Curated annotation (Swiss-Prot):
CDD domains: KP6_alpha, KP6_beta. Heterodimer of two small polypeptides that are not covalently linked. Changing residue 78 to R: In strain: NK3. Residues 1-19 form the signal peptide. This is KP6 killer toxin. Residues 20-27, 106-138 form a propeptide. One of its GO terms (molecular function) is toxin activity. Glycans are attached at residue 98. This protein is lethal to sensitive cells of the same or related species. The KP6 alpha subunit is known to recognize some cellular receptors before interaction of the complex with KP6 beta, precipitating cell death. Disulfide bonds join 32-39, 43-101, 45-92, 62-78. The KP6 toxin polypeptides interact with the cell independently, as monomers.
Length: 219
């Protein structure tokens, strides 16, 4: 009788596991459900031309920014409970990017409830030569600079949405975006333009270049 009860219990467990959507384990399914998700789609922003994944841009359009979505910091991808590909594509496209997606019907989502994405740390990786440093030099006194993100593959067309996003990084404590001319300015912390950090933000969001000029507002 005891053996029969054990076998029956195991059978119920197996039946319950097979009924879980998307092939998720009970623990992972409960984890996704905790975010209001059934984990059906996984999408991320990619750069034009290269197809490189852009974690910075992906994180900016996921989680708190998109209902019923969760940012998987391990993968750098956005998970959807519903088919939100059109909405997420609009986000990627607004930053001059493409989008890639795949179905999660056969993928087991790893638990990553404690994962966090350090967007600031990404800005310091592979820092390029400062693109605005020459502009920012004026004897011993630094010269105020303003910058904007531009599409270097399309004649330097300014990318307002990318500039706005790059201007909102935590490093720019007093940074602000001006709608009139599409530049990012900072009254005091504009040295981040000359150090290459703003360039990195444009790069992380959209593989964009920068256009930097002296800021006459603070001359």
């Amino acid at each position: 009788m005891l053996i029969f009860s054990v076998l029956m219990y195991l059978g119920l467990l197996l039946a319950g596991a097979s009924a879980l959507p998307n092939g998720l384990s009970p623990r992972n399914n409960a984890f996704c459900a905790g975010f209001g998700l059934s984990c059906k789609w996984e999408c991320w922003c990619t750069a034009h031309g290269t197809g490189n994944e852009l974690r910075y841009a992906t994180a900016a359009g996921c989680g708190d920014h998109l209902s019923k979505s969760y940012y998987d910091a391990r993968a750098g991808h956005c998970l959807f409970s519903d088919d939100l590909r059109n909405q997420f594509y609009s986000h990627c496209s607004s930053l001059n990017n493409n989008m890639s997606c795949r179905s999660l019907s056969k993928r087991t989502i790893q638990d990553s409830a404690t994962d966090t994405v350090d967007l600031g740390a990404e800005l310091h990786r592979d820092d390029p030569p400062p693109t605005a440093s020459d502009i920012g030099k004026r004897g011993k006194r630094p010269r105020p600079v303003m910058c904007q993100c531009v599409d270097t593959t399309n004649g330097g067309v300014r990318l307002d949405a990318v500039t706005r996003a790059a201007c909102s990084i935590d490093s720019f404590i007093d940074g602000y975006y001006t709608e009139k001319d599409g530049f990012c300015r900072a009254k005091y912390s504009w040295d981040l333009f000359t150090s290459g950090q703003f360039y990195q933000a444009c790069l992380r969001y959209s593989h964009a270049g920068t256009n930097c000029q002296p800021d006459p507002q603070y001359e």
